[in-house]
Amino acid sequence: MAIFLIDLPPSDMERRLGDALTVYVDAMRYPRGTETLRAPMWLEHIRRRGWQAVAAVEVTAAEQAEAADTTALPSAAELSNAPMLGVAYGYPGAPGQWWQQQVVLGLQRSGFPRLAIARLMTSYFELTELHILPRAQGRGLGEALARRLLAGRDEDNVLLSTPETNGEDNRAWRLYRRLGFTDIIRGYHFAGDPRAFAILGRTLPL
């Protein structure tokens, strides 16, 4: 088997939404049925201006094929239908988005100056989701997907939110630190969610 990174245009994400949500639920260890609850929000995100997604897929490879034998490479159709190991997507932040409103509120409560908030929030890409199936973790796929997704973005910054964890001791936190993300807000509680989150960010390009 071989792993390939692919871009997911909106039509492919809509067609493979069930597969992408399965990756999400398994990676986050959420109960079955969460897919149905999250699907409407993911579909709404797909329709946002500048939305972009990438995936890691697994295909059968002819290991003995000559390196120059391009016939051994999977076709675009094979790649677009191959089993999904990971998925990531995001879109530019904009006024009126719930996440932006929540983060701006958190920045204000944390005492950030108005101009600093404006500089940060005027031009950023929200890394909304990044998930790898548990069986495929530890292979560098998370970093590869993040780099592919963020390559060529023209925003000034990239921001994300991730659940707080003791000592930042999980794969997600290690990935974000390795990619150069720094603290924007720590211990933040989004409206309606009892968990504490960290808002992390860094400048673009990576």
Swiss-Prot record:
* Record-listed E.C. numbers: 2.3.1.-
Translocase found in the keyword field: no
Sequence similarity: Belongs to the acetyltransferase family.
Name listed for the protein in its UniProt record: GCN5-like protein acetyltransferase Rv2170
The record's keywords, sorted A to Z, are:
Acyltransferase, Antibiotic resistance, Transferase
Residue ranges of domain N-acetyltransferase in the record: 44-205
Q: What this chain does, per the record?
A: Acetyltransferase involved in the post-translational regulation of the central metabolic enzyme isocitrate dehydrogenase 1 (ICDH-1) through lysine acetylation. Can also use propionyl-CoA and succinyl-CoA as donors. Cannot act on the isocitrate dehydrogenase 2 (ICDH-2). Might play a role in regulating the TCA cycle and methylcitrate cycle when M.tuberculosis utilizes fatty acid as carbon source. In addition, it can acetylate the amino group of isoniazid (INH), one of the first-line drugs used for the treatment of tuberculosis, thereby canceling out the drug toxicity. Acts by catalyzing the transfer of an acetyl group from acetyl-CoA to INH. Following acetylation, INH is broken down into isonicotinic acid and acetylhydrazine. M.smegmatis and M.tuberculosis H37Ra strains overexpressing Rv2170 are resistant to INH. Has little or no acetyltransferase activity with other antibiotics such as streptomycin, neomycin, kanamycin, amikacin, apramycin and gentamicin.
Knockout mutant characteristics = Inactivation of the gene does not lead to general growth defects, and the deletion mutant grows to levels comparable to wild-type strain on all carbon sources including stearic acid. Mutations in this gene restore the growth delay in a icl1 deletion mutant.
What GO MF terms are annotated?
acyltransferase activity, transferring groups other than amino-acyl groups
Active-site residues?
Y176 (proton donor)
Catalytic activity reads: L-lysyl-[protein] + acetyl-CoA = N(6)-acetyl-L-lysyl-[protein] + CoA + H(+); propanoyl-CoA + L-lysyl-[protein] = N(6)-propanoyl-L-lysyl-[protein] + CoA + H(+); succinyl-CoA + L-lysyl-[protein] = N(6)-succinyl-L-lysyl-[protein] + CoA + H(+)
**Which Gene Ontology terms describe the biological processes this protein takes part in?**
response to antibiotic
Query: Which EC class is this protein assigned?
Result: transferase
Please report the organism this UniProt entry assigns to the protein.
Answer: Mycobacterium tuberculosis (strain ATCC 25618 / H37Rv)
Question: What result is annotated for mutating Y24A?
Answer: Unable to inactivate INH
Phenotype when changing E129A: Unable to inactivate INH
InterPro entries recorded for this chain?
Acyl_CoA_acyltransferase, GCN5-like_dom, GNAT_dom
Which Pfam family, any one of them, does this sequence belong to? FR47
